[in-house]
Amino acid sequence: MKKILIIFSGGQDSTTCLIHYTNIYKEIYCITFDYNQLHKSEIDSARFISNYFNVKKHIFVDLKCLKNLSISSLTDEKISILDNHPLNFSLPSTFVPGRNILFLTLSSIYAFNHQINSIVLGVNEIDFSGYPDCRNAFLKKMNDVVQIGMNCKINFQSPLINLSKAEIWALSDYWNSTQFILNNTVTCYQGIQGKGCGQCQSCILRNDGFNKWKSNPSYYMKKLKEKFNFDN
């Protein structure tokens, strides 16, 4: 039985991954992390979406301790989401140090114990906010660590890693899911469902990508088909 575990936030990218893999895998598992993020509505969105697509199992992991360990505007309302990170000005304040390291580690533990060999993370390094833990180089190193440390063949998959936001919208269009994603996902750092606040970096990237795709859907579908493996 083909099984896959999706690290699922309830945002545009992870939802696009979920929709894509429902057409490939028989059993889909989702894992969502509550790290005391201010935009908690994404957890409600994740729960609704996974129920809608009738995934095999969806677990929610309490990681509220991360707020006490890691400084970020996503967990501290006193820090502006528009500023640079107070400890590293080359990063946005929305960067949560160690977040994806923890997400991938804990997801690997779950996958190992449920005999799941594929873990999906909907990260992207074309149109992204500059997070170092959303880069392909990071994912490859983390995958090596997990395989060596657990003596397993778990593979990390990042199907959106080389796609622009416009191409990600084209992928949702390919699966006739654009309107669903527009209406039901939470990508906004303010936790506003749908189009979001329109001001945070996440909203800007999402809306800019949507407008580009909408201006020329056939062009971005062609670009998507040149780059994307629809069978994996």
UniProtKB/Swiss-Prot annotation:
Which pathway does it take part in? Purine metabolism; 7-cyano-7-deazaguanine biosynthesis
What keywords does the record list, in alphabetical order? Answer: ATP-binding, Ligase, Metal-binding, Nucleotide-binding, Queuosine biosynthesis, Zinc
Q: What class of enzyme is it?
A: ligase
**Amino acids binding ATP:** F8, S9, G10, G11, Q12, D13, S14, T15, T16, C17, L18
Can you supply a Gene Ontology BP term from the record? queuosine biosynthetic process
Residues annotated as binding Zn(2+) are C188, C197, C200, C203
Family annotation (SUPFAM superfamilies): Adenine nucleotide alpha hydrolases-like
| Cofactor(s) it depends on | Zn(2+)
Highest taxon, organism lineage? Bacteria
Drop me one GO molecular function for this one: ATP binding
Q: Does the keyword Cell membrane apply?
A: no
What reaction does this catalyse? 7-carboxy-7-deazaguanine + NH4(+) + ATP = 7-cyano-7-deazaguanine + ADP + phosphate + H2O + H(+)
UniProt remark on cofactor binding? Binds 1 zinc ion per subunit.
| E.C. designation(s) | 6.3.4.20
**The protein's role, per its UniProt record:** Catalyzes the ATP-dependent conversion of 7-carboxy-7-deazaguanine (CDG) to 7-cyano-7-deazaguanine (preQ(0)).
Homology family:
Belongs to the QueC family.
What protein am I looking at?
7-cyano-7-deazaguanine synthase
Q: Identify the coding gene.
A: queC
